[in-house]
């Protein structure tokens, strides 16, 4: 009552100024981390593609197949690590956003204890049921049983180390130290490249040597993550504790996340089996190639989303819903733009890219890839929306509904295949439409939970995207008509035109006024620095 209006005005001004400064710092951190993750992605992807050829040549087709099938038995436990990793990351990031160091220490200790416990359970299962399956059920070429055994044991040890050390990865991402994450990943990739060349020198069984060296590399990498955390983060010094209440929350969260991961495995493998039953293994091979291409293209927006995720959770923990809403909406739009800029050349030049990569293009592969590009574009909206949900920690109802909807594609596809004799391409189109409906349901459920109007999704995300998509395809189409013959020159021209077309359309139609002003300001600042040099 005694506070003067001038004082209130000054307080409001200082609050707005502080808020703007914090937002600018957070945006700069997101941009920096995104760039670091993209540099990591380009290097890792390039080296991985090269090492795949070297490994195949060094091991031979048979041993390479043994390594993949035996290691694949252990990789079935991968969804456990994914679910626990998401739970760890969410609770650590949330505690960090609250600014409670004591709570953060308790959460980290609890998370590490849970990971150690699950790692031991996986180890027991792998050395009993898993080992029995490998030795009794898998078809291993005669004389390679010992090598297969060592490959399996190395894979089990690698899985154990991965599970035990995942909380340290979550800590690095929660603190948004993407530089460390990128540099250690690059070290791991280059180490694997070195191993490939060592295989041609070491005079022992190459398959055994390769599996042992890979697990040694992963051990060193995990130790690097641990040492980095111990040096930079106080809360990373682990103490054995068991907090029943916190453990219950983390287990419940991880359990419902695991339900979602199992649903993904279910509909993915379910569709694969249906395609095999109705059309044979050739269609499975085409689908495998399409999924591989989609996965590579989707990395271009997933790195951006990894950089944004900690800020979404922290802003929710701090009660800053305005900034959180802005992040979710902006992340959805710009993830789509990143996917679009890479998808356009693939959509127009699918057949030539496949010929360049594989030599021979399998049947249905072109159509599969083109449909999966559209699935990937729709998927760009998924992660920012579910990031907001995971920030709340209230995921049970959503995971049940989402998992049921995604799994419904299997019985729907079966009915259409059995009674309406649809084509393999129609199976993918069915999957695409179910993904669209599921995304709409995600928005309807999640937006009210984080106090965001559902209309924002359509006015601030979908409408700018519709405007961009209405024009962005015209210049590439004109190039496609003007240069009728396929070739490398046409591919390069198409890539350049697609990038320029997307950039212009996004700037004119896909950005709001403040975003355009920010972009112009950054370009001018960059030009100023460049000309000064």
Segment roles from a protein language model:
Residues 82-98, 174, 233-234, 290, ...:
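Helix-loop junctions and terminal segments of transmembrane helices
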Residues 8-21, 447-458, 474-533:
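Membrane-proximal transmembrane or re-entrant/amphipathic helices at the cytosolic face
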Residues 4, 15-30, 208-211, 225-269, ...:
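Interhelical loop/hinge segments that connect adjacent transmembrane helices in multipass membrane
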